Amino acid sequence: MKFFIAIFLVFSVLFSSDDYELPEEFDKQTYEVGENIFEQKCTSCHVKFIDMNKVVRNFFHEDNKMNLKAPTANQISFRLKQQIGDKSDIEFHLYETADYLKSYVLAPDRSKSICLEGVIKYFNGMPSMRGVVTEEEIESLNHFLYFLEGFNGINEYFHDETLF
């Protein structure tokens, strides 16, 4: 009996669901550069992370009781992947989301927002970041935002996007 328990434990460890493989498109250095850009140039309005369940409750049940001035980075990460382009090819999807982000960050327009109307109604319009961030910085920022949510193993902010 102990033999079978030992075999079970070995296989449980070898084939546990904690094993993952990061997408080959993930670049740690670009992610960290984008994260630094976010922290330096975006956090005056955007919070980096709030649990998605709390975010949903805040906007749809508590009338923005948290007084957020702008979507959180993890909200943007989630919506970016859901609303822009074809997510079946991560490499191409990164180009699509970067193009969108450049367009929006440099010339914001509510009609181009990826956020739900029930969320953006709480925010003033985003100011243009033209002259504040370069297109190259936006590409790094896009890499950070793209991989912030939904990819286990990159950071502590993973959640199961299929639940939303």
Label each PLM-derived region with a short phrase.
Residues 1-28, 146-164:
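N-terminal export/targeting leaders of redox proteins
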Residues 62-128, 132:
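Extracytoplasmic electron-transfer domains, predominantly the class I c-type cytochrome c fold
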Residues 34, 38-49, 141-145:
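The canonical Cys-X-X-Cys-His
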Residues 39, 88, 111-164:
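Flexible coil segments in periplasmic/lumen-exposed cytochrome c-class electron-transfer proteins
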Residues 16-38, 50-55:
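Electrostatic cytochrome c docking/interface patches
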